[in-house]
Amino acid sequence: MQSDDIIWDVINKNFCSFKTTFNKTKFCKNEYNVTGVCNKVSCPLANSRYATVREEEGVCYLYMKTVERAHTPNRLWEKIKLDPNFMKAIEQIDSHLEFWPGHMSHRVKQRYIRITQYLIRMRKMRKQIKRELVPIKKKAERRDATRENKALIAAHLTTNIKKELLERLNKGTYADMHYFPEDIINNVLEKEGEADQFSEEEADENEEEGEEEMEEEFEDDIDDIEDAGGAFEYVEGDDDEDDIDDEYENEPYQDDDEEDDDDDDDDDEEVKPQITKKRGPTFKPTKKTPQKRVHMEVEIEEETENQAN
């Protein structure tokens, strides 16, 4: 015959494998404990009549222990599946614990409420989107990058080969060596020619637009200068040459005979040729200086060779 008082005295005063203490409070680790507190009322070992609720894979079960099954440990706990509906499960607990103590049925209901609450939270968390950390393989990334580069190079090669073959067909290097019908080749060549003409027309249009813009800018600059009261003055090169010739005519000319009279001792020596270099003078405009002017400088070098007779 089981004696609850003797069992509790042994467990309370001596060792119990399920008993733990935290902050001077005793707790029970037994899976059938209703409250989790280590005391005589909540201890599943020291009570011959006991009931609790357990959750297994999201399903709640009601466990009951009676004195009649104390001699069969494998059949000690009666297992009853509770309905997933909360109200129906409460009715099941009330019906099975109708003649049990009130505090026992109340604690079982409290435990069932806590279990249903954390099951609801678990369902909500499963529905939420979670971030997964995926490991990145550097070797695989490098391999993919090299493959992409090779594919790009191959694509460029194919386009260049295509252009080269079309150019050779246009030039007629293959003549009648190809195995394709002439209609297809002519169509391809016509399409390529149209594309080239279109590109050439676009280039010509761009050049014409650029020339027109340059002319417009030049005309705008001229208009601005005329508005400011200035004028262009160009200096021609022919007039400069005439002026330089006049200067040389006005300068006195020394003859080789006069030099021989001055130097009496050097009669037998030959007179070396003299090379005269003169830089042409720069002419400044007489009119008022405009804002923009064109300056031209002319340099003329003349060599005169005079030999003594």
From Swiss-Prot:
Keywords: Nucleus. GO terms for biological process: maturation of 5.8S rRNA; maturation of LSU-rRNA; ribosomal large subunit biogenesis. Residues 275-293 have a biased composition (Basic residues). Residues 194-309 are annotated as: Disordered. Residues 195-227, 235-270, 299-309 have a biased composition (Acidic residues). The keyword GTP-binding does not apply. The keyword Transmembrane does not apply. Its main location: nucleus. One of its GO terms (cellular component) is nucleolus. Belongs to the MAK16 family. This is Protein MAK16 homolog. It comes from Dictyostelium discoideum (Social amoeba).
